[in-house]
Each structure stands twice: as structure tokens, then as C-alpha cells.
Amino acid sequence: MKHLLYFALAVLVFSCRGTDNPVANKAPETLLQVDSIVRSGDLRLGTNVTLHWYGMDVDGFINGYHITVDETSSFTSSTDSTFSFSIEAGQDTTDILLTVAAEDNEGLIDPSPATLIVPIKNAAPEVAIDPDGLLSDSAFIVATVDWRATDDDGDETIESVEFKLNAGNWLEIGTSISLLSFATDPQGNVAYYKNAGFIDSISGADLQGENFIFLRARDRAGVYSEVDTTAGFYWKAANSATLIINGQPEYIGSTYKEWMDSANVDYDYLQMDAVSGAGIPAYWDPTFEIIMSSYSKIALFTDATVFPTKSGDDYLLNILALSTQKFLQKGGKLFTASQFSSNMAGGAFLDIFPVESLVFSSGQARLTNDSTLAPLQPGFPSLQPQNIVLGITPIIPSADATALYNGQITKIAGWNGATTMGATRTQNGSINQVFVALPLHVFNRPINHGGILLDHVFNAVF
């Protein structure tokens, strides 16, 4: 037993002496989840590829990995990554050499990295114009289009989006999604806008025939998308300083045109039909902002008819509120005639037009054919309807407005309230808004009272 104990101690002593010569650190080993990718032609991978790898170290642990892609190196502690490979301009395909070398906890790197040839193919970008972005066959001053550009290799690989008008040159518009608006003048020059911001002017509008807008995208490999094109459309330019916007039926608009003709006012006319969609743009903003900016005076006729928008139906006064505000801020002058309904008690129009609120009451307010709207400001004519006008809604003028008309209202079944039927607003010492809360076309008895009012507004007030 003693001999066995002495032998064990001797082994222990000699073993301790052996620590002066430690075992050398062994290099780690690196492996890719796949060791080869065999694809050709259209079966090649896209430029965005996700790869996985791992490392093993028999005498320690893995600290990270050295990744080399076509001689460009990086270090990571991750075991996977999505690579966005690039292809040189003008090339459709290429083979990417990728190596992964593990590094252990003592800084030793795998001397025989895992390697992989990645066959990739560039995907061409795609661009699409919203087909609802234009009127089907015509555009009044402004054509607005919405578009999207995508790329299966990643939208970030799109380097430019370009448009051209008819046979013109291709022009870059950036890659951020935007509404593009094009406004023509009588000479065929076109100002183009991005999200209502003016960019530049070009020539090339065809005011006699059809017009086309073309769009294409280019990726970082220099590959272009197929060209997308709007439907052909006829283009009408602004030809006067005054615009009539009629949101009532066309036969009523004929009355307004006759009155403006009698007043010798040159004007352009825009008929809007909520049922047929005639004259209604797919994108009210910025289309109408740009249309209005082409004029110095506007006459707006509307009522409680609702019109379609991208975000739902609404009244024309609300839809045009923002564009109207910008028009007025730039010095424009606006005449508005609108009949109201109880559903219009609130809305964006109250912030823009010279109206604080509408007057509603139980019962009914009406104007008879012997009622008179008496002017409260000098120079404005009195107004008398041809027939009984039901559903009259008076207004409370806004704090910065001046009452214009007082109505001799017949009050039925307990109706009670203010009887103001119009108001004006002044800017820089002169009237820039005239608002009447009534269907002006019926005020033509015994003479053309509505026409006299328009004559006074557009030839004396504005």
C-alpha cells in the first residue's frame, strides 16, 4: 500500500512539472449553412441575400467572424446577415465571392475560411402611375398624378425616378413618393410641381391634341423599369383673370355665365358634376391650389351637394377650404354664393369664409317672391327672388367680417334667429371676399338682380 502511495505522488509531481510546456491554442473552424449555390439564368438570387454561418473551437469559444465580400472586410459577432450586393452599372448578373473566418477568444483566426460563390441577378425596378390620377380625357389647367416605384432588390436600390411630357426630355424627380402636378399656360409651357411645391418649367404641352406623361425608374445597376404612361388627355389652359367654379347643375351655371357676359367680364368656366364626376379631380389638393393660383378673381357657386374625395364625400366649401385660403393669402379675390343645409353646421369652411356660424331653429325660414334682401353696404343692389325660396339658412358673420344683406324672412312654425344673409371681409383696406348665403340664380325678379350683383362685385368692388 505504501509503494502505491509513493507512486501516485511521483506521478503528481512529474505532472506538475509538465505545465512549463502548455498545449498550443488550436484555430477555430468556420462553417456556412450552405456550402454551394448552384443557380443560373433567371434562377439566380436577387441582390438581397440572407446567409447563416457558425464556428467551432475545441479549446475555447468564438469571439466573432471576419466577413469578406469581394475583398471588402468587416467584423461581426452575429451568425447571420442579410447582404445587399451590388452589381456594376450595365451588368445584369454577377458572382459574389464571400468568405467567413471565425476568430476565437485568443484572437486566432481560422486560416481556412468558409467560402461561398453567390450567383445574383439584378431585378429591374417597377414604376406605376395611379390610373385615377387624371381625368379620363381632359385636364383643366392642372394634371396631377400619383405614382409608386418599387424594386425586388429593395426600394433603396432605386437611384432615380424620371418623367417626360409628350416627346420631351426625361427629367429626374427624386425617389420619394409624391404627387406630381403639371400646369399649362396658353403658350403650352408647363410648370411642374412636387407635392404642390414648384420645381421648374418646361415646354411641350399640346393644347390641340392629346397629351401623355411618361414615368420610369432606374436602379443602382443602371437598369431602367418599363415605362408607365398616363391615358391621353386634352389640356385646357387659363385664358383670363377670372374663374367661375360652378358646383350646381349645368343649367344653373348657364345663368351665371349669362350674367357675367352681360357684365362684360371675361372668364374661364369650370363645371363640376358630383353625379357624373365631370370636372372633379382625383386629387383635390394640390390640384385646386394650383388652379386657383392661375387667377386673381374667382366666383364660386355651390350648395349642399356632396362631392367625392379620396377620403370620403364632403361639401364643396369644405373640400376647397385649404386651396381657397392659400388663394386669398396670395391676394386673390373671391365671390361665393352658397345655400346651406342643417348638415353643414360645422366644417373647415367656417375658418376660411367670412362666416362665424349658421343660424338654425325649429320651424322654417323662407323667402317669398315679394321678399327683399336689403343691402347693408353702399353700392350693393337689393335682391328679390323669382319664386318662394324654402330652407333659408342665415349666417352669423365672423368677427372680422361685415354684414352685407338682411333678409325679409318669413318665419314659419316658431322659427327664430338672425336674418343676415351675406357678409364681406376686407384685406389691406379693400374687400377681398363677398359671401351670400343663398342660391343666387333664383334672384332675378323683377329684373336681373343676381347679374347686377355680379356686375357690381367684379367691376366695382374687385
Q: Positions of the model-derived regions?
A:
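Bacterial Sec-dependent N-terminal signal peptides
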Residues: H3, A8-R39, G222-E226, F462
